[in-house]
Amino acid sequence: MALNCDDKAHIRAIWPCLASHAEQYGAEALHRMFLCHPQTKTYFPNFDFHANSAHLKNHGKKVMNALTDAVKHLDHPEASLSSLSDLHAFTLRVDPGNFALLSNNILVVVAVHHSDKLSYETHQALDKFLNVVSGLLTSKYR
């Protein structure tokens, strides 16, 4: 599912609002994922899963910063995500289905905080973008 020029424009328009709250939104998305899908906690054995914990904020910021880097490289996001793909596939061995779960929760967080900016077109573009990212992160799984 390739991103077209309109998708990229919608992503670039809303992303600064998300990047400026990377820690908060990333932590909220992870917290929602862990609550709704407790099986995803298995990859974080020493985490404090309480809302606003330092663990959630730290990892949430990493997630959102990686997405911000991918947004900066929308024409070739695979270059910015290659090392993360290696890490998740070969070292962490994260269930590839978890990326879709987290993507959904990121969209929920965007809707909660930016419903006024989340037009149908922007929602669709973000969904496509997160699917592209998920696909790239799972591309090295066998």
Swiss-Prot record:
GO terms for cellular component: blood microparticle; haptoglobin-hemoglobin complex; hemoglobin complex. InterPro entries: Globin, Globin-like_sf, Globin/Proto, Hemoglobin_a-typ, Hemoglobin_oxygen_transport. PROSITE patterns: GLOBIN. Heterotetramer of either two alpha-B chains or two alpha-C chains and two beta chains. The two major hemoglobins, B and C, associate upon deoxygenation to form a trimer of tetramers, BC2, that has a much lower affinity for oxygen than either component alone. Belongs to the globin family. The alpha-C chain is a component of adult hemoglobin C. This is Hemoglobin subunit alpha-C. The lineage of its organism: Eukaryota, Metazoa, Chordata, Craniata, Vertebrata.
